[in-house]
């Protein structure tokens, strides 16, 4: 749940950043209505119970209602949606919920019944949700990747400024504790 929480905290901060761009023609106070955070989890038996608890705390998951079969047919995935105003914070290596009053976040959670690997999850995202949501851009994160406070905005801006742009990627930096660079002379330089 630590990796998931770290990513979601970064995503939530990006949504707040876009809502605070009050002079923008595209973003501003109601920007959260233009953003849907889709979470795809690969396998109901594989998902970390603490991550499930975090998702339940955010309001986008209900434990105990998912079934393997309905009317004798195998279930492929379970889909939950919710607009949350609950935030997340990290305390050491654990994610925890915190009350949040400012920016709502629209969440869509797909819990695949079977573990079918990452590419299948991407296919779910693009073929199932992409068709329904019809987004202008999509930004993909693996759990554990922490976007900077305006990273998603900067990626959106690249597409907005160049409509023929088919793809973009952000910069990835290693996250180190304060002072850890000094232990490795290659990183310290």
Curated annotation (Swiss-Prot):
Enzyme class, spelled out: transferase
GO molecular function: chitin synthase activity
UniProt cross-references to Pfam families, sorted A to Z: Chitin_synth_1
Topology relative to the membrane: Multi-pass membrane protein
Single GO biological process annotation from the record: cell wall organization
Keywords tagged on the record: Cell membrane, Cell wall biogenesis/degradation, Glycosyltransferase, Membrane, Transferase, Transmembrane
Alphabetical list of InterPro entries matching this protein: Chitin_synth, Chitin_synth_fun
GO cellular component: cell septum; plasma membrane
E.C. code: 2.4.1.16
Main location: membrane
Annotated catalysed reactions: [(1->4)-N-acetyl-beta-D-glucosaminyl](n) + UDP-N-acetyl-alpha-D-glucosamine = [(1->4)-N-acetyl-beta-D-glucosaminyl](n+1) + UDP + H(+)
Keyword set includes Cell inner membrane: no
Subcellular location: Cell membrane
Domain of life of the organism encoding this protein: Eukaryota
Described function: Polymerizes chitin, a structural polymer of the cell wall and septum, by transferring the sugar moiety of UDP-GlcNAc to the non-reducing end of the growing chitin polymer.
Similarity field: Belongs to the chitin synthase family. Class I subfamily.
Name of protein: Chitin synthase 1
Organism field: Exophiala jeanselmei
Gene: CHS1
